[in-house]
Amino acid sequence: MQERHTEQDYRALLIADTPIIDVRAPIEFEQGAMPAAINLPLMNNDERAAVGICYKQQGSDAALALGHKLVAGEIRQQRIDAWRAACLQNPHGILCCARGGQRSHIVQRWLHDAGIDYPLVEGGYKALRQTAIQATIELAQKPIVLIGGCTGSGKTLLVQQQPNGVDLEGLARHRGSAFGRTLQPQLSQASFENMLAAEMLKTDAHQDLRLWVLEDESRMIGSNHLPECLRERMTQATIAVVEDPFEIRLERLNEEYFLRMHHDFTHAYGDEQGWQEYCEYLHHGLSAIKRRLGLQRYNELAARLDAALTTQLTTGSTDGHLAWLVPLLEEYYDPMYRYQLEKKAEKVVFRGEWAEVAEWVKAQ
């Protein structure tokens, strides 16, 4: 039964998106997991907790005996069947537990008895996690070009189209503003960092990478924060600023935040509940900056938002949203971004419209 246990092996697993059957308890998996991992636990949360208490009170032999007692009979067979199905579906995958200890070895042995030989990660999730952290530290040392610009400048799309671009907002499942949440919940901090490391490793492995192209982000992207090693390098990076006409930005924002989000919510929840979720999403975003807008201005814009939603519901038109979006950009988002950009003006090396910045980036 083959085992993977070298640094290069760990990196190769992440680069190849190797399917990982993670047999840790769900609570451990939620706290941090690798990108291509699926959670098929040997023990559920309650079983793991009981075994842990037994280990502290009576030692390892008693804990092991309790574990075998809890995962026996029909429960054991159901879990073997689930692992077996996952192995057959992912013939080039690998088993993983916390440290490559008893849990993954037990599952490996039970699978062997069921006719399947399947490798495991020697060192487990902990070893993969350390590999991810170290890879990010190393890869962050390459030069970085940041793509800046006001809200609606198409920065994310520009980054996505570069072979050396890494979409930080996509990995974080958040677009970085008060209206930035998506229908996908954000991952734990550790899982986000693991996703980032894997993406950087894959991007670096598939080309002769000289520099990174990233969006000019703040430290926080929703509830996730950038690893300090990368954030520190980004503060030293050069910046290319997209300066598109205001009307073009409005078109992008209409497409992204009104048309697409409405479509996504109704696709996920159905027409009626999807509409309610969409309305709540927009109101929540505006409410998040109530204090900065001031109560009077917030109430004015919230009333315009309600009117725009009524128009959209009855006619399908999103044009009414301009009545609150335009002042929100002119009075809040644009001044805020310009103020932030002024503080790092010496790092700006290029300005232009979207296509011009894209061409400039390709030439670097």
From Swiss-Prot:
GO terms for biological process: tRNA wobble uridine modification. NCBIfam families: PRK11784.1-1, PRK11784.1-3, tRNA_sel_U_synt. Its EC number is 2.9.1.3. Keywords: Selenium, Transferase. Residues 14-137 form the Rhodanese domain. This is tRNA 2-selenouridine synthase. The keyword Membrane does not apply. GO terms for molecular function: transferase activity, transferring alkyl or aryl (other than methyl) groups; tRNA 2-selenouridine synthase activity. The gene is selU. Belongs to the SelU family. The active site is at C97. It is an enzyme of class 2 (transferase). Monomer. HAMAP family: tRNA_sel_U_synth (MF_01622). SUPFAM superfamilies: Rhodanese/Cell cycle control phosphatase (SSF52821).
